[in-house]
C-alpha cells in the first residue's frame, strides 16, 4: 500500500510540473506572437517622441545648440509701452491717465499684476522642464522593453533546452530504476553493476574450465569449506572475506551446481540420441541386406528361366525339321517362319517376366515402408 501511495504522489507531482511548464510555454508563445511590442504601440511611442522634440526644439534645444556653438541668440527689441503724459491744454486735465503710468496706478493693482506675471512665467518654466524629462522617460521605457523582450527570448530558449534535458534524464532514471535517484545512488549502482560484471566473468571462466575438465571442482569440499567459514568468524577474518565476497561465493556455488546438473542432463540426452541412431542404423542395415538377397534371388531365377526357354524353342525347331523332309526352298521358308514365331514367343515371355519382377519389387518396397512405420524398440 505505501508503495502505491508514493507512486500516486509522484505521478501527481509530475503532472503538476508538466502543467506549469505548459502554462509557461503558452505565455511565452503569446508574447512571441505579439513580438514583444506590437507595431501600433511602437508607432505611437515614436510619434510621441517626435512631437516632444518638435515642441522643445525652439525653446530648449535650439538655444542649447547655439550656446554650444558660441553664438548668442538674437535679442528681441523691448517696446516701451508707457506713453508720455498728455499736456493739460490738450484736454488731459480731466484726470484721464494711461493705465501704464506707474504714478497713477494704485499699489494694490501693481501687486496683483506682478503676481499674475510671476505665475504665468512659473507655469511656462515647469512645462518646459517637464517635457524633456517625459521624452527621456519614454525613450528609456522603449529601450527597456526592447532589451527585456530579447532577454526573455534567450531565457526561454535556455529553459526549454534544460527542461528537455531534465525530462530525458528523469525518464531514463524512472524507466531504468522505477524512481528518482540522486547522483550518489546512481554512482553506487554503477559500481555494483561493475562488480557483478566482474563476478559473472569469473563465473564464466570457471564454467569453461569445468566443461573442459581441466580443473574439476569438488562441491562437497566447497560445502564443507563454506560451513567452516560460517561457524568460525576468525577463519573469515584470516581469509579476508567480507559480506559481498560471501555473496559472490554463494552465487558461484549455486551456479556450479546448476551447471553440473545441466551437464548431466545433457550427457543423458546425448546417450539416448546415440542409442536411437545405433538402433536405426542396425535396422537399416538389416533391411538393405534383405533387399539385396531378394534381388539376387530374383536375378538367379531370371537367368535359369531364359536358357530353359531357349532349349525348348531349339528342340521344337529341330523336331519340325526332321518331320518335314521337303525341298530346299520350302524348308527355308518354313524355317524363317518358325524362327519368327520363336522370336515373338520369346519376346512375349520376356515381357511377362519383367512385369513380374516389377510387381515383386513394388511389394518389397511396400513391406519396407510398413516396417519403417512400425514403432522402433528402445
Swiss-Prot record:
Pfam families: RIC3 (PF15361). Keywords: Coiled coil, Endoplasmic reticulum, Membrane, Transmembrane, Transmembrane helix. Residues 368-378 have a biased composition (Basic residues). Residues 1-26, 355-367 have a biased composition (Basic and acidic residues). Interacts with the deg-3/des-2 acetylcholine receptor. Its main location: endoplasmic reticulum. One of its GO terms (biological process) is regulation of muscle contraction. It comes from Caenorhabditis elegans. The chain crosses the membrane at residues 42-62, 127-147. This is Resistance to inhibitors of cholinesterase protein 3. Belongs to the ric-3 family. Residues 90-103 have a biased composition (Gly residues). GO terms for cellular component: endoplasmic reticulum; endoplasmic reticulum membrane; intracellular membrane-bounded organelle; neuron projection; neuronal cell body; synapse. Residues 163-172, 281-304, 345-354 have a biased composition (Acidic residues). The lineage of its organism: Eukaryota, Metazoa, Ecdysozoa, Nematoda, Chromadorea. Residues 180-212 form a coiled coil. Required for maturation and cell surface expression of acetylcholine receptors. Residues 35-152 are annotated as: Sufficient for function in acetylcholine receptor folding. It is a multi-pass membrane protein. Expressed in pharyngeal muscles, body wall muscles and in most neurons. It is found in: Endoplasmic reticulum membrane. GO terms for molecular function: protein folding chaperone. Residues 1-32, 74-105, 155-179, 207-246, 267-378 are annotated as: Disordered.
Amino acid at each position: 500500500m505505501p508503495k502505491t501511495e508514493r507512486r500516486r504522489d509522484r505521478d501527481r507531482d509530475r503532472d503538476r510540473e508538466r502543467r506549469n511548464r505548459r502554462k509557461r510555454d503558452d505565455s511565452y508563445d503569446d508574447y512571441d506572437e505579439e513580438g514583444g511590442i506590437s507595431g501600433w504601440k511602437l508607432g505611437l511611442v515614436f510619434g510621441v517622441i517626435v512631437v516632444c522634440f518638435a515642441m522643445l526644439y525652439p525653446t530648449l534645444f535650439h538655444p542649447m545648440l547655439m550656446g554650444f556653438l558660441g553664438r548668442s541668440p538674437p535679442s528681441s527689441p523691448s517696446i516701451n509701452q508707457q506713453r508720455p503724459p498728455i499736456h493739460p491744454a490738450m484736454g488731459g486735465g480731466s484726470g484721464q491717465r494711461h493705465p501704464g503710468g506707474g504714478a497713477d496706478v494704485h499699489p494694490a493693482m501693481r501687486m496683483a499684476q506682478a503676481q499674475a506675471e510671476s505665475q504665468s512665467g512659473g507655469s511656462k518654466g515647469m512645462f518646459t522642464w517637464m517635457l524633456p524629462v517625459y521624452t527621456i522617460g519614454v525613450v528609456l521605457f522603449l529601450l527597456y522593453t526592447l532589451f527585456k523582450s530579447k532577454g526573455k527570448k534567450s531565457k526561454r530558449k535556455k529553459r526549454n533546452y534544460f527542461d528537455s534535458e531534465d525530462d530525458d534524464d528523469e525518464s531514463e532514471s524512472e524507466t531504468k530504476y522505477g524512481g528518482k535517484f540522486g547522483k550518489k545512488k546512481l554512482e553506487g549502482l554503477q559500481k555494483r553493476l561493475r562488480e557483478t560484471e566482474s563476478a559473472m566473468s569469473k563465473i564464466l571462466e570457471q564454467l569453461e574450465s569445468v566443461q573442459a575438465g581441466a580443473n574439476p571442482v569438488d562441491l562437497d569440499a566447497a560445502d564443507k569449506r563454506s560451513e567452516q567459514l560460517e561457524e568460525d568468524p576468525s577463519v573469515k577474518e584470516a581469509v579476508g572475506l567480507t559480506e559481498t565476497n560471501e555473496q559472490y561465493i554463494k552465487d558461484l556455488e549455486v551456479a556450479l551446481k546448476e551447471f553440473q546438473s545441466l551437464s548431466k542432463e545433457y550427457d543423458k540426452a546425448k546417450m539416448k540420441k546415440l542409442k536411437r541412431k545405433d538402433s536405426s542404423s542396425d535396422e537399416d542395415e538389416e533391411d538393405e541386406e534383405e533387399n539385396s538377397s531378394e534381388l539376387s534371388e530374383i536375378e538367379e531365377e531370371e537367368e535359369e528361366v531364359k536358357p530353359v526357354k531357349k532349349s525348348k524353342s531349339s528342340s521344337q525347331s529341330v523336331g519340325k525339321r526332321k518331320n518335314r523332309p521337303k525341298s530346299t526352298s520350302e524348308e527355308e521358308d518354313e524355317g524363317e517362319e518358325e524362327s519368327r514365331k520363336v522370336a515373338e514367343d520369346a519376346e512375349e515371355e520376356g515381357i511377362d517376366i519383367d512385369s513380374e519382377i516389377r510387381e515383386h519389387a513394388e511389394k518389397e518396397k511396400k513391406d519396407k515402408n510398413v516396417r519403417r512405420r512400425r514403432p522402433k524398440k528402445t
